[in-house]
Curated annotation (Swiss-Prot):
SUPFAM superfamilies: GroEL apical domain-like, GroEL equatorial domain-like, GroEL-intermediate domain like. Forms a Heterooligomeric complex of two stacked nine-membered rings; one of alpha and the other of beta subunits. The keyword Isomerase does not apply. It comes from Sulfurisphaera tokodaii (strain DSM 16993 / JCM 10545 / NBRC 100140 / 7). Disulfide bonds: none annotated. Transmembrane segments: none annotated. Residues 536-552 have a biased composition (Basic and acidic residues). Gene3D superfamilies: GroEL, GroEL-like equatorial domain, TCP-1-like chaperonin intermediate domain. Molecular chaperone; binds unfolded polypeptides in vitro, and has a weak ATPase activity. This is Thermosome subunit alpha. Belongs to the TCP-1 chaperonin family.
């Protein structure tokens, strides 16, 4: 009995444990990071992703790449989760987070080969992370964002946006300049000052619409909102100046009773009386809106044909079936109150805009609501020659918006171009000597992983990576803390801040946190148990004959 096999897992279940499981997971994560490495930085290359429907996406945006890839390996999925966490928290630095996590795991693999326990590596990495965050705060430069409309502040913000967008499809020339100004204007409008300093930037109040046709230069920022709808009736005006706008989430229709009901009609006069009463009900609703001064009606629900007729007779422009999210943005943009009950509506519920106009954009008609007095929501309308260019422009703008939000929430910046990583590596090696023990080796490997970032940037720019790192180390040893890789000119610069290559501290710190969390999560796994695939026709949790639910206890021999 003592030598009998223990039957524990379902037949067909695969299990690997200890060093084998860890090596397998590290290999999967490092492979994913290797795929993204070439997309890092302003000279990063694009990936062409083709989904199962044949749709093509061309991008170098890390968040989009990992989202579109159908990752199967569970360890690689942990890196995908790290990218999603990075994207959700700060909206930028996703490629950096995945690549750094892969580098940390690659270095951890070297330590495992030296028989250093994963727990010691994890502790070393955590100490290195905490020290790195401390050093980043010391290296950071505070910027003045007290007046978002001042030329000096706008100039500083433009430099930050430029660094974020320089790796994207639309980078360069007048197109980029126009997009940068639109993004800064949009953020300046919706930003809300915080009592402790800095700003809260609710990005959900900045709507981005895309319309094929024209070029990126034809894009515009609307101080109000653009609705992808048409005016509902041909007899209505197409243009209303000094618009007083009723924003409704009630239908301009005769409501159906909640319970099923039938009407017994015995004569033609009764039909006429019924229709007349219905028309009167709708006319009263329109008269009420007209009486409070509304000359534009934006409705979340339907507008009856008869109501459309009465609105047209009153010269009121109306739009129906508007999305709830747009209704809420209109409330913020126009200073309106959403009207749920038309009979209780008052003039104070109306919003104001200088102009409401239906225009043709490309092949479609859209309603522009512009010139709100004090808008708290705005709309960026993107134009472009094809869907791919529009999608990449939208991703660029999203990255830029998040970058500005990060720097306004915490107005501190550091030098880009691998300058911070090189300085961190230098100081972490000094710190490692003070820690001692085997954890010292983990901290030194953390420093090595950070130094790979400027090497990757150099490689994407066609520079010699090892020579670049040697030169960078020499400059940082002399005290040039902002020396980094100038990838645009293919050389090393003494001061990346002077070249306007700036990154928000919040993004840089989150990259380190996300990467370390993902790497340590994988290093903690020492057992990998993969259930046998379901047989055809079998469902998860399906009951066997005899009525018992099948569980993963069907025997598999484990010696």
């Amino acid at each position: 009995m003592a030598n009998a096999p223990v039957l524990l897992l379902k037949e067909g279940t695969q299990r690997s444990s200890g060093r084998d499981a860890l090596k397998n997971n590290i290999l999967a994560a490092v492979t994913l990071a290797e795929m993204l490495k070439s997309s890092l930085g302003p000279r990063g290359l694009d990936k062409m992703l083709i989904d199962s429907f044949g749709d093509v996406t061309i991008t170098n945006d890390g968040a989009t790449i990992v989202k579109e890839m159908e990752i199967q390996h569970p360890a690689a999925k942990l890196l995908v989760e790290a990218a999603k966490a990075q994207d959700a928290e700060v909206g930028d630095g996703t490629t950096s987070a995945v690549v750094l996590a892969g580098l940390l795991l690659d270095k951890a693999d070297d330590l495992l080969d030296q028989n250093i326990h994963p727990t010691i590596i994890i502790e070393g990495y955590k100490k290195a992370l905490n020290k790195s965050l401390e050093i980043i705060d010391q290296l950071a430069t505070k910027i003045d964002v007290s007046n978002l409309n001042s030329l000096a502040t706008r100039d500083q913000l433009k430099k930050i946006v430029y660094t974020t967008m320089s790796s994207k499809f639309i980078a360069g020339g007048e197109e980029m300049d126009k997009i940068m100004n639109m993004v800064i204007d949009a953020v300046s409008i919706v930003a809300e000052p915080l009592p402790e300093g800095g700003y809260n930037v609710p990005l959900d109040l900045i709507k981005i619409d895309k319309k094929k046709g024209g070029s990126i230069e034809d894009s515009m920022l609307v101080h109000g909102l653009v609705l992808d709808k048409e005016v509902v009736h041909p007899g209505m005006p197409r243009r209303v100046e000094k618009a007083k706008i009723a924003v409704l989430d009630a239908a301009l229709e005769v409501e159906k009773p909640e319970i099923s009901a039938k009407i017994s009609i015995t004569s033609p006069e009764q039909i006429k009386a019924f229709l007349d009463e219905e028309a009167k009900y709708l006319k009263d609703m329109v008269d009420k809106l007209a009486s409070i001064g509304a000359n534009v009606v934006i409705c979340q629900k339907g507008i009856d044909d008869v109501a459309q007729h009465f609105l047209a007779k009153k010269g009121i422009l109306a739009v129906r079936r508007v999305k709830r999210s747009d209704i809420e943005k209109l409330e913020k943009a126009l200073g309106a109150r959403i009207i749920s009950s038309i009979k209780d509506a008052t003039p104070e519920d109306l919003g104001y805009a200088e102009l409401v106009e239906e225009r043709r954009v490309g092949n479609d008609k859209m309603v522009f609501i512009e010139g709100a007095k004090n808008p708290k929501a705005v709309n960026i309308l993107l134009r472009g020659s094809n869907d791919m260019a529009l999608d990449e422009a939208e991703r660029s703008i999203n990255d830029a918006l998040h970058s500005l939000r990060n720097v306004l929430m915490k107005p501190m910046i550091v030098a880009g171009g691998g300058a911070v990583e090189t300085e961190l590596a230098l100081r972490l090696r000094e710190y490692a000597r003070s820690v001692g023990g085997k954890e010292q080796l983990a901290i030194e490997k953390f420093a090595e992983a950070l130094e790979e970032i400027p090497m990757i940037l150099a490689e994407t720019a066609g520079m010699e990576p090892i020579q670049t790192l040697m030169d960078l180390r020499a400059k940082h040893a002399k005290g040039l803390i902002n020396a980094g890789v100038d990838v645009m000119n293919g050389k090393i610069a003494d001061d990346m801040l002077a070249l306007n290559v700036l990154e928000p501290v919040r993004v840089k710190a989150q990259v380190l946190k996300s990467a370390v969390e993902a790497a340590t999560a994988i290093l903690k796994i020492d057992d990998l148990i993969a259930a046998a695939p379901l047989k055809s026709g079998e469902k998860k949790g399906e009951k066997k004959e005899g009525g018992e639910e099948e569980k993963s206890s069907t025997p598999s021999s484990l010696e």
